[in-house]
A protein has these predicted regions:
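Conserved nucleotide-binding/hydrolysis micro-motifs of P-loop NTPases
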Residues: 45, 152-156, 242-243
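Short His-Asn-centered micro-motif
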Residues: 17-18, 125-130, 150-152, 239-240
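Gly/lys/ser-thr-rich phosphate-binding loops in alpha/beta enzymes
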Residues: 2-53
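Hydrophobic/aromatic beta-strand patches that form the interior of the parallel beta-sheet core
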Residues: 14, 38, 146-148, 235-237
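PAPS-dependent sulfation machinery
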Residues: 42-126, 180-197
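PAPS-dependent sulfotransferases, especially Golgi type II membrane carbohydrate sulfotransferases
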Residues: 1-15, 20, 185-236, 242-319
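Conserved phosphate-donor/acceptor-positioning beta-strand/loop module used by diverse small-molecule
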Residues: 127-128, 138-164
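PAPS/PAP-binding and catalytic site of the sulfotransferase fold
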Residues: 23-36, 137-142, 162, 236-261
Length: 319
């Protein structure tokens, strides 16, 4: 019997991963200003491969095949200028790259072999929503991939999700980004797979908080599954450390990806209003809001992850 096979495309690649609303777009814009880093790319279909694998809808073999095949084609399309985004206000637009001419040249170039050799060693950059939660699958499928995982305060993520209505019954829309499942005539996000009954009984606030605390727990478990070699291909970047100590973090990123940041990187920090203070003025108001709207048990779990997050920042709220 024949087996699925994809020849590995050995190209340096970096994925910026993290939960929705965790600072991935900002990180990708910063990376784009580094020496020899491609502009950001995103592909919903590649992401859905590991999303569906996470909830056991596709096998290991099929997921690995599709990830490899999809990555190869995405990289090829990027080289020839196919599907390049020129929408001015979009974070992934070629027009927002420091050298947009490079992408217009790709559109007109016919020398594909020259591009495939990648003599300038330009690192391909892409976004992965919740990618590290499938880190073992991704790193084993794509041996040249490194992952920068954006980690943000769970209070900020929960509040942001609620303001975006992610806990409401919005998942029947045909253009919804996240994978969706049908359960007893109800459409729920894939995050609720395995606890659909509980999800449907919850209010919108408890739904969001439980999803987020589940994601934090799942990411912790996934990191523990990685071998020591795989862990060296992963870098955690805490959002608040990045915005309060940017130059320290930029140097740490440089060491990880083996690329220097540039004067354009420093200019972008100014545009993004970095450095910033550790907490926004309304941080305590957000905590009070979440406490008021959620049930005590659910809120308590959220605060456990907030405490873990602050511990990583060496910050003690009680000081």
């Amino acid at each position: 019997m024949s087996e699925l096979f994809v020849k590995e495309l050995k190209v340096q690649s970096i994925a910026v991963s993290g939960f929705t609303r965790s600072g991935k777009a900002m990180m990708m814009k910063l990376l784009s200003t580094y020496d020899r880093i491609d502009k950001p790319s995103e592909d919903i279909f590649l992401e859905h491969i590991y999303f569906l694998h996470k909830i056991n809808k596709i096998s290991d073999q099929t997921a690995k095949y599709l990830l490899k095949k999809n990555f190869n084609i995405l990289y090829y399309f990027n080289l020839i200028g196919r599907n390049i985004n020129f929408k001015k206000d979009d974070w992934s637009s070629a027009l927002n790259y420091h050298n947009p001419k490079m992408y217009t040249e790709r559109l007109n170039s016919t020398d594909l072999n020259k591009r495939l050799t990648n003599k300038n060693k330009i690192i391909y950059q892409m976004m992965l929503h919740t990618g590290l939660n499938s880190g073992k699958l991704l790193l084993s499928s794509l041996p040249s991939l490194k992952i920068i995982e954006m980690v943000k305060n769970p209070i900020e993520i929960a509040y942001s999700w609620i303001k975006k209505n992610y806990g409401k019954n919005i998942y029947n829309k045909p253009t919804i980004y996240a994978p969706t499942c049908k359960f007893k005539k109800n459409i729920v996000p894939y995050y609720a797979s395995g606890w659909e009954e509980e999800y449907l009984k919850m209010n919108e606030y408890d739904r969001v908080i439980k999803i987020i605390t589940n994601l934090f727990l799942d990411r912790e478990k996934e990191i523990k599954k990685l071998s020591n070699t795989e862990k060296k291909r992963v870098m955690l970047v805490f959002f608040d450390t990045l915005v309060t100590q940017p130059k320290i973090e930029l140097k740490r990123i440089s060491k990880f990806i083996k690329r220097d940041f540039t004067s354009k990187t420093l200019k972008l920090l100014t545009v993004e209003k970095i450095p910033r203070s550790l907490f926004s003025n309304d941080y305590l108001k957000k905590i009070k809001f979440l406490k008021k709207k959620s049930t005590p048990k659910i809120f308590k779990k959220l605060m456990i992850y907030e405490k873990k997050y602050l511990k990583n920042l060496n910050y003690n709220k009680d000081d």
